[in-house]
């Protein structure tokens, strides 16, 4: 069958993915889908280098600010949200551009979701309305009564998971806990994917990370973390352990001692650098992502190269 083309733009933290994507989107009449496991959370702005609202108004973005920090969000959630976003973008004859550095989310998008029923967006909308009317706590209690085993694996704040679980139960009559959630390759996926991996020189990347971490601190990262702690981020293991957040949560928990600031900053930088190594290793396992070194190229040059490839092959 005919497959619509989707652009994938990956790379390690600090490689310039966001800047390139903002140049690329107008060239192909595209909209951006964030492939970042932390940008889904409201309030996690500075530490995730989230683009501003003004930029998002100029270039439409998807999968940003869709969860409260007390909710959990994983690769399965990402898959269904990303597919829905792709369908929406393509229905308006625009081009989906998936941009980010969360390798496992790209893997899930490419390989297909774990086994389980397909989403029922109408039923999901109905459940969302019920959550507004009855409260998410009431829906969680309903889930406890219908599938206590699965309910025990999440919290009463996990709105997305509670709604998805009740969606499955109401649609199929089966418990969520009865399904196998191991990922399988989906050979019949409907998208033709053109993948690119930004791979800057390690020294340039290290320089970018140093600047990035300094800039985040200047913009108020510590105050952002303090606000998120007040909102309950420590109850979300995934969000509270994210690089750029866990280091400063520990700093605040210790009473914000001045003498520990520089050590915490260095830990923040070191952890970010180590993560980029893991990202590069992950993406190089996938031949779909063609490596692109930005050396000697402007952001516009890179965007034009990707756009040219899209028009030739898309």
UniProtKB/Swiss-Prot annotation:
Its cofactor is Mg(2+). Gene3D superfamilies: 1.10.20.140, P-loop containing nucleotide triphosphate hydrolases. Its EC number is 2.5.1.75. This is tRNA dimethylallyltransferase. The record marks 102, 124 as: Interaction with substrate tRNA. HAMAP family: IPP_trans. Keywords: ATP-binding, Magnesium, Nucleotide-binding, Transferase, tRNA processing. It holds the Pfam family IPPT. Substrate binds at residues 13-18. GO terms for biological process: tRNA modification. It is an enzyme of class 2 (transferase). The gene is miaA.
